[in-house]
C-alpha cells in the first residue's frame, strides 16, 4: 500500500482514471484530507462506497500517531513525538508567534552528519522520510493544536539536502493550493552545507529562505564541530552561497551557535565579518543547546551581544535567536533520544 500523502493531485487523478474512476474524486479526497483534516477514507461523506473501498485497498493516509505531546510553561511552544506506521519516531516543534504558528519539521529519522552540538545525530540515520511523511507532521500538529500553521522550518532531525528528492517534492506539495497552500516565503530550509546540493537547490529557484549552519569562520574549528567541513571548505561553501544568492536573489541566513570559549571570541567575530562582508545575508546567533554527550557550554549573553555588535559594526544584519521551549527539551533531537533510549 502507498501513502496517499506522497501523491500530488495530478498523480492521484491519473491513478483514479487508470482504475476507471472519475478524476474529480481526487479533488474531493484532497479536500477531506488537507482542509477538513479527515484521515479515514470511510469518513469522507461525498465519496461513493465503491471508491472508498478502492482507496482503502490501495492507500493509507500516513499521518503519524502522537506518542508524546509537551507544552512549555508559557504555552507558546509544543513538542511532539510522532510515530510512523513502521514504528519509527520523529519529533516536531510548534512555536506560536504574533505573526502566526511556525513548525520545525524533521526530514529524516536521525541524522548522519555528526555535528557535535546536535542530539539528533548521536545514533546516526535510520531512514529518510518521504515527502508525505514530512507533510504529515504539519497536518498532525494542526489537528492537535486546532490552529493553522503558516510557517515551516526544515530544521528538525535530519539533513534536508541529504534527502533531496523527498524534500523538494515536499516543497512542491506543501506550497500547492491543492494541499496546505503555505507560501514559499514562509519556508526556511536549514543545511549543514552540502555544496553540490545547495547549487542544485538554487537551480530549482524556490522563493524559500536558505539557512546555513556555519558555526565557525575557520576551517579547522568547523571541522572539529561539523564533519561535513572535512569535505567542503568554507571557501567552497561561500562560493555555493554566492551561486544561490545570484540565482535566486534571496538573502541567506547563517546560523551561528555560540559555544563558550570555542567560537565566541572577538577574533572569531572579526573573521566572520570578513568572510561574510558584502553578501546578501543575515546572521542568526544561537546560544548552543547543551547536551550531556559533549562538553559544549553556552556563551554568556554578554559575549553573544559583543559578538553580534562586531558583526553589526561591519554592516552585517544580525539577530540573537529567542530561546523557546527549553523547559520541554525543544532543542533538536533531545526529546526523541530520551524517549527511544528508555
Curated annotation (Swiss-Prot):
Belongs to the radical SAM superfamily. RlmN family. S-adenosyl-L-methionine binds at residues 158-159, 190, 213-215, 289. Disulfide bonds join 104-332. Reaction proceeds by a ping-pong mechanism involving intermediate methylation of a conserved cysteine residue. Binds 1 [4Fe-4S] cluster. The cluster is coordinated with 3 cysteines and an exchangeable S-adenosyl-L-methionine. Residues 97-327 form the Radical SAM core domain. The active site is at residues 91, 332. This is Probable dual-specificity RNA methyltransferase RlmN. Its cofactor is [4Fe-4S] cluster. GO terms for molecular function: 4 iron, 4 sulfur cluster binding; metal ion binding; rRNA (adenine(2503)-C2-)-methyltransferase activity; rRNA binding; tRNA (adenine(37)-C2)-methyltransferase activity; tRNA binding. One of its GO terms (cellular component) is cytoplasm. Specifically methylates position 2 of adenine 2503 in 23S rRNA and position 2 of adenine 37 in tRNAs. Keywords: 4Fe-4S, Cytoplasm, Disulfide bond, Iron, Iron-sulfur, Metal-binding, Methyltransferase, rRNA processing, S-adenosyl-L-methionine, Transferase, tRNA processing. GO terms for biological process: rRNA base methylation; tRNA methylation. Its main location: cytoplasm. The gene is rlmN. It comes from Clostridium botulinum (strain Okra / Type B1). It catalyses: adenosine(2503) in 23S rRNA + 2 reduced [2Fe-2S]-[ferredoxin] + 2 S-adenosyl-L-methionine = 2-methyladenosine(2503) in 23S rRNA + 5'-deoxyadenosine + L-methionine + 2 oxidized [2Fe-2S]-[ferredoxin] + S-adenosyl-L-homocysteine; adenosine(37) in tRNA + 2 reduced [2Fe-2S]-[ferredoxin] + 2 S-adenosyl-L-methionine = 2-methyladenosine(37) in tRNA + 5'-deoxyadenosine + L-methionine + 2 oxidized [2Fe-2S]-[ferredoxin] + S-adenosyl-L-homocysteine. NCBIfam families: rRNA_mod_RlmN. [4Fe-4S] cluster binds at residues 111, 115, 118. PANTHER family: 23S RRNA METHYLTRANSFERASE, RADICAL SAM CORE DOMAIN-CONTAINING PROTEIN. Pfam families: Radical_SAM, RlmN_N. It is found in: Cytoplasm. Its EC number is 2.1.1.192.
Amino acid at each position: 500500500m502507498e501513502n496517499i500523502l506522497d501523491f500530488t493531485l495530478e498523480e492521484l487523478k491519473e491513478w483514479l482514471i487508470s482504475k476507471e474512476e472519475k478524476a474529480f474524486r481526487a479533488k474531493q479526497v484532497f479536500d477531506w484530507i488537507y482542509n477538513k483534516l479527515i484521515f479515514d477514507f470511510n469518513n469522507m461523506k461525498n465519496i461513493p462506497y465503491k471508491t472508498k473501498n478502492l482507496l482503502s485497498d490501495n492507500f493509507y493516509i500516513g499521518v503519524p500517531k502522537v506518542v508524546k505531546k509537551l507544552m512549555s510553561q508559557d504555552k507558546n511552544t509544543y513538542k511532539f513525538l510522532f510515530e510512523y506506521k513502521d514504528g519509527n519516531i520523529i519529533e516536531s516543534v510548534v512555536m506560536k508567534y504574533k505573526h502566526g504558528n511556525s513548525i520545525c519539521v524533521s526530514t529524516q529519522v536521525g541524522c548522519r552528519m555528526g555535528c557535535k552540538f546536535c542530539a539528533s545525530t548521536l545514533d546516526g540515520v535510520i531512514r529518510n522520510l518521504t515527502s508525505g511523511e514530512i507533510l504529515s507532521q504539519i497536518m498532525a500538529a494542526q489537528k492537535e493544536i486546532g490552529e493553522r500553521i503558516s510557517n515551516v522550518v526544515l530544521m528538525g532531525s535530519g539533513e534536508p539536502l541529504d534527502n533531496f528528492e523527498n524534500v523538494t517534492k515536499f516543497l512542491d506539495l506543501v506550497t500547492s493550493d491543492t494541499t496546505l497552500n503555505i507560501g514559499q516565503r514562509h519556508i526556511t530550509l536549514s543545511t549543514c552545507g552540502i555544496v553540490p546540493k545547495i547549487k542544485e537547490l538554487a537551480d530549482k529557484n524556490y522563493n524559500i529562505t536558505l539557512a546555513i549552519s556555519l558555526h565557525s569562520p575557520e576551517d579547522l574549528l568547523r571541522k572539529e564541530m561539523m564533519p561535513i567541513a572535512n569535505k567542503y571548505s568554507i571557501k567552497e561553501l561561500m562560493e555555493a552561497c554566492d551561486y544561490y544568492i545570484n540565482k535566486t536573489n534571496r538573502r541567506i541566513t547563517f546560523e551561528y551557535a555560540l559555544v563558550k570559549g570555542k567560537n565566541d571570541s572577538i577574533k572569531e567575530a572579526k573573521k566572520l565579518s570578513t568572510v561574510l562582508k558584502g553578501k546578501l545575508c543575515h546572521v542568526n546567533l544561537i546560544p548552543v543547546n547543551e547536551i550531556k554527550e559533549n562538553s559544549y557550554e553556552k556563551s554568556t549573553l554578554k559575549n553573544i551581544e559583543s559578538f553580534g555588535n562586531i558583526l553589526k559594526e561591519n554592516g552585517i544584519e544580525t539577530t540573537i535567536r529567542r530561546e523557546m521551549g527549553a523547559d520541554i527539551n525543544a532543542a533538536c533531537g533531545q526529546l526523541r533520544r530520551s524517549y527511544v533510549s528508555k
